[in-house]
Amino acid sequence: MGRILLIDDDQAFTDFLAGYIRDSYPLLQVEICNNPIVALQRIKASAYDLMLIDLEMPTMDGLKLLGFATQTGMDKNRIVILSGREADFLHNLCPMGTCLAVLNKFEARQKAVLDMIFSSLQKKAGGP
């Protein structure tokens, strides 16, 4: 089973995205963390196949979480940064190679990229 850690302070968004993943990709297990400080402990305590991190959160931004995760051994190519900002801003902030992807979480076109990532993880977990 592929394990995903979804870190975002917007509970409505995390509930929606986790529900979508559970319905569409049954071999993927989603853990939600709405508090970035609590996420630090989860990152240290468990191994994840994918992390989805919101860029803008109170107390700690997503880039600090990205740095912490990679320092504790998480492969940067298993981390996706999500934001409500425009793509150009995001790509300037996180140049290619910083992480697997930097996506606007509200743009429908960006959903296709997430679906490709989820589909790949589902296949690695033994699914169709």
List each language-model region with its residue ranges:
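Receiver (REC) domain active-site loop signature in two-component systems and cognate sites
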Residues: 57
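Short amphipathic alpha-helix used as the core "switch/output" element in two-component signaling
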Residues: 41, 63-74
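Two-component/phosphorelay signaling modules centered on CheY-like receiver
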Residues: 11-31
